[in-house]
């Protein structure tokens, strides 16, 4: 992550049609997560971005973005573009199409924190989509404390970024 963040440039504009093609039309088979912002899909290559060995995670908004939502998203993109912290993935690309706003990050092949903590059938399916034959072992207590410390450090950084 640190090497990616150090080499990060301002996020590139990525056309929506390119994201649609790369994710097979935002196919369920490419979905690796879902959260408050929307769904996350994996793709291996995007012509608008330099190739990265880990692939890409494309976060999509659950609904179309209105004028106010677009302004808020542009503000968030400016903040994320300026961020450089060892515990934050760099924002590589953006698509601010009113029909579907998307943020592009490097793909974390280790899975989400939620999936590493709660080994549900859905988590096992997502691990398989990331290339695992079986789920990785649960996080140790020491690893959980490191995650907690690193997340707190990243949140503090974001909230004090000016």
Predicted regions span which residues?
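Glycine-rich ATP phosphate-binding loop
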Residues: 41-64
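Protein kinase glycine-rich loop
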Residues: 29-40
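Protein kinase catalytic-loop region centered on the HRD/HxD motif
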Residues: 153-162
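Regulatory alphaC helix of protein kinase catalytic domains
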Residues: 73-78
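A short, low-complexity linker immediately N-terminal to eukaryotic Hanks-type protein kinase catalytic domains
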Residues: 7-29
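Short beta-strand micro-motifs within the conserved protein kinase catalytic domain, predominantly
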Residues: 90-101, 109-110
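Conserved N-lobe motifs of Hanks-type protein kinase catalytic domains
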Residues: 35, 83-86
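Structural motif in protein kinase domains
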Residues: 108-129
């Amino acid at each position: 992550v640190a090497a990616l963040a150090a080499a990060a440039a301002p996020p590139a504009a990525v056309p929506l049609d390119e994201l649609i093609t790369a994710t097979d039309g935002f196919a369920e088979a490419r979905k690796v997560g879902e959260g408050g912002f929307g769904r996350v899909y994996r793709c291996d290559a995007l012509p608008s971005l330099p190739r990265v060995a880990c692939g890409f995670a494309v976060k999509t908004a659950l609904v179309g973005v209105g004028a106010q939502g677009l302004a808020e998203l542009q503000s968030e993109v400016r903040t994320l573009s300026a961020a450089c912290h060892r515990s934050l993935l760099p924002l590589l690309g953006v698509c601010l199409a009113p029909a579907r706003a998307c943020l592009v990050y490097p793909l974390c092949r280790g899975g989400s924190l939620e999936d590493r903590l709660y080994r549900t059938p859905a988590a096992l399916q997502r691990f398989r989509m990331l290339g695992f034959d079986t789920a990785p072992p649960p996080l140790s207590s020491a690893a959980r404390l490191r995650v907690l410390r690193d997340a707190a450090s990243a949140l503090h950084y974001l909230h004090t970024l000016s």
